[in-house]
Amino acid sequence: MKINQPIETNYTLSCPVNIALLTDFHNSDPEPVLESLQRRRPEIITVAGDLILGDLPGKKGLKIDENRHAVELLRGCAALAPTFVSLGNHEYMLSEADLKIVRSTGATLLDNTHVSHQGMVIGGLSSAYCHVYRTFRQQHSGEGMYPPIPITELKKRQIPQLGWLDEFEQQDGFRLLLCHHPDYYPLYLRERKIDLIFSGHCHGGQWRFYSPIHGETRGVFAPGQGFFPKLTSGVHDGKLVISKGLCNTTFIPRINNPTEIVYITNR
């Protein structure tokens, strides 16, 4: 899948290092992304979910093998700078064998966990889809590595695993959280002691138009938020950064909504 040349969106925030934020790559063309990263040379690269293009479970072979461009992107990123990856809803079916390949790229996988890096603490909150499907897989272990799950089963009980965040927010240092779903922010994250949160998921609201009521350009629809969502791009409360993403996964075109790489520079 080809992507148009992404725009480079720049935000200046209180942050110890310069960071690139990638989201919603969906196994597309890594070349324009890596070209931008090679030119900009961020100190850290973050991938906040939906690295792959998800599919219904049931095909033969590893899911990650169907997403070779995603693996290529991670290897390219890890060769440029320390790279940290969290899991979005499109990664829900990945098995431990799949995740082993993700780790083999040199990127650090953050699956409801955190690591320390140069005075920072970087965590990754996995999509609730991952937990739902892992539970389902255990209950249907005799049906292969990727037992098919009814969509109604997948979408119920959509609560991420939050317990580890209590320890995360008590860590010393600048706390950066990768969380694919921006709709988790008002529900679970706003009041936590987290310095910066990186999200994506909404593809910028698909169609973006100027709202005279709000005095800004806003998206039309986002999963998890519905029509005229509030959280589709930009910086919110000085701590939630949302990327419009790198790809499109639907036949509905993006209108007034270019793909983007977000660069965070420190004040």
Which residues fall in each region the model found?
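Beta-strand-turn-beta hairpins that frame and shape the catalytic cleft
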Residues: 11-20, 107, 114-127, 170-174, ...
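Conserved beta-sheet core of the metallophosphoesterase superfamily
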Residues: 84, 182-262
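Short, charged, surface-exposed secondary-structure boundary motifs
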Residues: 55-56, 118-121, 133, 206-213, ...
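Acidic, histidine-bearing metal-coordination/catalytic regions of metal-dependent phosphoesterases
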Residues: 1-20, 25-26
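Active-site neighborhood of phospho(di)ester-bond hydrolases with catalytic His/Asp-centered motifs
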Residues: 21-23, 44-50, 82-89, 110-112, ...
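Binuclear metal-dependent hydrolase catalytic cores centered on His/Asp/Glu-rich metal-binding motifs
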Residues: 104-105, 118-175, 179, 185, ...
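Core catalytic region of metal-dependent phosphoesterases/phosphodiesterases
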Residues: 31-118
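Acidic/histidine-rich helix-loop elements
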Residues: 19-31, 51-68, 93, 130-151, ...
